[in-house]
Protein backbone atom coordinates (compact mmCIF):
# COMPACT_ATOMS: atom_id res chain seq x y z
CA UNK A 1 0.00 0.00 0.00
CA UNK A 2 0.90 3.64 -0.31
CA UNK A 3 -0.21 6.91 1.26
CA UNK A 4 -1.00 10.23 -0.41
CA UNK A 5 -0.04 13.36 1.49
CA UNK A 6 -1.97 16.16 -0.21
CA UNK A 7 -1.40 18.99 2.27
CA UNK A 8 -1.41 22.49 0.81
CA UNK A 9 1.56 24.74 0.15
CA UNK A 10 3.45 25.70 3.31
CA UNK A 11 1.93 23.00 5.50
CA UNK A 12 5.27 21.22 5.88
CA UNK A 13 5.18 18.22 3.53
CA UNK A 14 8.99 18.02 3.47
CA UNK A 15 9.14 17.80 7.25
CA UNK A 16 6.49 15.05 7.20
CA UNK A 17 8.42 13.09 4.56
CA UNK A 18 11.52 13.32 6.77
CA UNK A 19 9.44 12.15 9.75
CA UNK A 20 8.13 9.10 7.84
CA UNK A 21 11.66 8.16 6.82
CA UNK A 22 12.94 8.69 10.38
CA UNK A 23 10.18 6.47 11.77
CA UNK A 24 11.31 3.65 9.47
CA UNK A 25 14.97 4.44 10.18
CA UNK A 26 14.37 3.88 13.90
CA UNK A 27 12.68 0.57 13.07
CA UNK A 28 15.87 -0.62 11.41
CA UNK A 29 15.10 0.24 7.78
CA UNK A 30 18.26 2.18 7.11
CA UNK A 31 17.97 2.51 3.32
CA UNK A 32 15.38 4.92 1.98
CA UNK A 33 14.77 6.80 -1.28
CA UNK A 34 13.62 10.43 -1.50
CA UNK A 35 12.60 11.52 -5.01
CA UNK A 36 12.32 15.27 -5.49
CA UNK A 37 11.92 17.90 -8.20
CA UNK A 38 15.45 19.24 -8.60
CA UNK A 39 18.95 19.12 -7.12
CA UNK A 40 18.83 22.42 -5.12
CA UNK A 41 16.11 20.85 -2.94
CA UNK A 42 18.85 18.69 -1.37
CA UNK A 43 19.48 21.43 1.19
CA UNK A 44 15.75 21.64 1.98
CA UNK A 45 15.66 17.88 2.54
CA UNK A 46 18.73 18.03 4.79
CA UNK A 47 17.20 20.94 6.74
CA UNK A 48 14.03 18.95 7.41
CA UNK A 49 16.00 15.79 8.28
CA UNK A 50 18.42 17.47 10.68
CA UNK A 51 15.56 19.38 12.35
CA UNK A 52 14.26 15.98 13.46
CA UNK A 53 17.63 14.87 14.80
CA UNK A 54 19.17 13.25 11.74
CA UNK A 55 22.70 13.91 10.49
CA UNK A 56 23.46 16.06 7.46
CA UNK A 57 25.45 13.26 5.87
CA UNK A 58 22.59 10.77 6.12
CA UNK A 59 21.08 12.23 2.93
CA UNK A 60 23.26 11.76 -0.14
CA UNK A 61 22.39 12.79 -3.72
CA UNK A 62 22.69 10.09 -6.37
CA UNK A 63 24.86 12.52 -8.36
CA UNK A 64 27.72 11.55 -6.01
CA UNK A 65 28.07 8.37 -8.07
CA UNK A 66 28.53 7.98 -11.81
CA UNK A 67 25.75 6.19 -13.65
CA UNK A 68 27.94 3.15 -14.40
CA UNK A 69 29.24 2.53 -10.87
CA UNK A 70 27.56 0.91 -7.85
CA UNK A 71 26.26 3.19 -5.10
CA UNK A 72 28.52 2.84 -2.07
CA UNK A 73 26.16 3.83 0.74
CA UNK A 74 25.66 1.22 3.45
CA UNK A 75 22.83 3.14 5.05
CA UNK A 76 21.23 6.47 4.35
CA UNK A 77 18.65 8.36 2.36
CA UNK A 78 19.33 8.42 -1.38
CA UNK A 79 18.12 11.70 -2.91
CA UNK A 80 17.07 11.35 -6.55
CA UNK A 81 15.56 13.97 -8.86
CA UNK A 82 12.84 13.10 -11.38
CA UNK A 83 15.02 14.01 -14.41
CA UNK A 84 17.82 11.83 -12.99
CA UNK A 85 15.41 8.93 -12.49
CA UNK A 86 14.85 8.65 -16.24
CA UNK A 87 18.46 9.19 -17.33
CA UNK A 88 20.27 6.61 -19.45
CA UNK A 89 23.79 6.23 -20.79
CA UNK A 90 24.41 3.31 -23.10
CA UNK A 91 23.47 0.10 -21.26
CA UNK A 92 23.37 1.86 -17.89
CA UNK A 93 20.39 3.53 -16.27
CA UNK A 94 19.87 5.36 -13.00
CA UNK A 95 16.75 3.26 -12.36
CA UNK A 96 18.78 0.03 -12.49
CA UNK A 97 21.49 1.61 -10.34
CA UNK A 98 18.91 2.56 -7.68
CA UNK A 99 17.20 -0.85 -7.61
CA UNK A 100 20.57 -2.63 -7.43
CA UNK A 101 21.47 -0.51 -4.39
CA UNK A 102 18.09 -1.04 -2.74
CA UNK A 103 18.00 -4.80 -3.30
CA UNK A 104 15.01 -7.00 -4.13
CA UNK A 105 13.97 -7.24 -0.45
CA UNK A 106 13.94 -3.44 0.03
CA UNK A 107 11.24 -2.48 2.55
CA UNK A 108 12.19 1.12 3.29
CA UNK A 109 10.40 4.30 2.21
CA UNK A 110 10.17 5.61 -1.34
CA UNK A 111 8.97 9.19 -0.94
CA UNK A 112 7.83 10.97 -4.09
CA UNK A 113 7.93 14.67 -3.23
CA UNK A 114 6.05 16.83 -5.78
CA UNK A 115 4.54 13.56 -7.01
CA UNK A 116 2.59 15.36 -9.76
CA UNK A 117 5.91 15.45 -11.66
CA UNK A 118 5.01 11.85 -12.64
CA UNK A 119 1.57 12.96 -13.82
CA UNK A 120 1.98 12.20 -17.52
CA UNK A 121 2.74 8.50 -17.08
CA UNK A 122 -0.38 7.25 -18.87
CA UNK A 123 -0.14 9.60 -21.84
CA UNK A 124 -3.59 10.29 -23.25
CA UNK A 125 -5.16 13.10 -25.22
CA UNK A 126 -3.40 16.47 -25.20
CA UNK A 127 -4.27 19.74 -26.94
CA UNK A 128 -2.38 18.55 -30.02
CA UNK A 129 -3.82 15.03 -30.04
CA UNK A 130 -2.62 11.77 -28.49
CA UNK A 131 0.63 11.88 -26.53
CA UNK A 132 2.90 9.21 -25.11
CA UNK A 133 3.49 8.65 -21.41
CA UNK A 134 6.26 10.73 -19.83
CA UNK A 135 9.52 8.91 -19.24
CA UNK A 136 9.97 10.19 -15.68
CA UNK A 137 6.43 9.07 -14.85
CA UNK A 138 7.06 5.64 -16.33
CA UNK A 139 10.35 5.31 -14.42
CA UNK A 140 8.57 6.32 -11.21
CA UNK A 141 6.01 3.55 -11.69
CA UNK A 142 8.73 1.04 -12.59
CA UNK A 143 10.62 1.92 -9.40
CA UNK A 144 7.47 1.08 -7.40
CA UNK A 145 6.99 -2.17 -9.34
CA UNK A 146 10.62 -3.30 -8.98
CA UNK A 147 10.52 -2.82 -5.18
CA UNK A 148 7.19 -4.40 -4.20
CA UNK A 149 7.84 -4.33 -0.42
CA UNK A 150 8.67 -0.62 -0.35
CA UNK A 151 6.56 1.77 1.68
CA UNK A 152 5.45 4.39 -0.83
CA UNK A 153 4.59 7.97 0.11
CA UNK A 154 3.23 10.39 -2.49
CA UNK A 155 3.36 14.08 -1.54
CA UNK A 156 1.78 16.79 -3.68
CA UNK A 157 -0.41 19.83 -3.13
CA UNK A 158 -1.74 19.36 -6.68
CA UNK A 159 -2.11 15.59 -6.88
CA UNK A 160 -4.27 15.36 -10.00
CA UNK A 161 -5.68 18.22 -12.01
CA UNK A 162 -6.89 15.51 -14.39
CA UNK A 163 -7.80 11.95 -13.36
CA UNK A 164 -5.33 10.65 -15.95
CA UNK A 165 -2.57 12.19 -13.84
CA UNK A 166 -3.29 9.80 -10.96
CA UNK A 167 -2.01 6.88 -13.02
CA UNK A 168 1.34 6.98 -11.19
CA UNK A 169 -0.32 6.24 -7.82
CA UNK A 170 -0.32 2.48 -8.31
CA UNK A 171 -0.10 1.78 -4.55
CA UNK A 172 -3.40 3.43 -3.60
CA UNK A 173 -5.49 0.45 -4.73
CA UNK A 174 -7.75 2.50 -6.97
CA UNK A 175 -7.97 -0.28 -9.56
CA UNK A 176 -7.22 -3.98 -9.84
CA UNK A 177 -8.29 -6.94 -7.66
CA UNK A 178 -10.93 -6.23 -4.98
CA UNK A 179 -11.86 -2.87 -6.54
CA UNK A 180 -14.67 -1.72 -8.82
CA UNK A 181 -12.27 -1.26 -11.75
CA UNK A 182 -10.41 -4.07 -13.51
CA UNK A 183 -7.50 -1.90 -14.65
CA UNK A 184 -6.20 1.64 -14.84
CA UNK A 185 -7.85 2.38 -18.17
CA UNK A 186 -11.29 1.42 -16.87
CA UNK A 187 -10.77 3.51 -13.74
CA UNK A 188 -9.72 6.59 -15.71
CA UNK A 189 -12.54 6.36 -18.25
CA UNK A 190 -15.21 5.77 -15.59
CA UNK A 191 -14.10 8.62 -13.32
CA UNK A 192 -13.71 10.97 -16.27
CA UNK A 193 -17.31 10.32 -17.29
CA UNK A 194 -18.41 11.20 -13.76
CA UNK A 195 -16.61 14.55 -13.81
CA UNK A 196 -15.81 16.57 -10.68
CA UNK A 197 -18.37 14.67 -8.58
CA UNK A 198 -16.60 11.36 -9.31
CA UNK A 199 -13.21 12.89 -8.46
CA UNK A 200 -14.63 14.03 -5.12
CA UNK A 201 -15.85 10.48 -4.46
CA UNK A 202 -12.35 9.14 -5.11
CA UNK A 203 -10.89 11.64 -2.61
CA UNK A 204 -13.61 10.82 -0.06
CA UNK A 205 -13.04 7.07 -0.34
CA UNK A 206 -9.26 7.45 -0.05
CA UNK A 207 -9.70 9.58 3.07
CA UNK A 208 -12.18 7.06 4.52
CA UNK A 209 -9.68 4.22 4.05
CA UNK A 210 -6.86 6.24 5.63
CA UNK A 211 -4.80 6.57 2.45
CA UNK A 212 -5.17 10.30 1.80
CA UNK A 213 -4.79 13.47 3.83
CA UNK A 214 -5.21 17.02 2.51
CA UNK A 215 -4.90 19.81 5.06
CA UNK A 216 -4.32 23.51 4.45
CA UNK A 217 -3.03 26.45 6.42
CA UNK A 218 -5.72 28.61 8.00
CA UNK A 219 -6.06 32.23 6.95
CA UNK A 220 -7.21 33.17 10.46
CA UNK A 221 -5.16 35.99 11.97
Placement of each model-derived feature along the sequence:
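Conserved P-loop NTPase motor "coupling/switch" region that bridges the ATPase
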Residues: 109, 129-220
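Walker A/P-loop
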Residues: 2-20
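SF2 helicase/translocase NTPase motor core
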Residues: 4, 14-15, 25-139, 179, ...
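Conserved Walker B
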Residues: 8-9, 114-116, 157
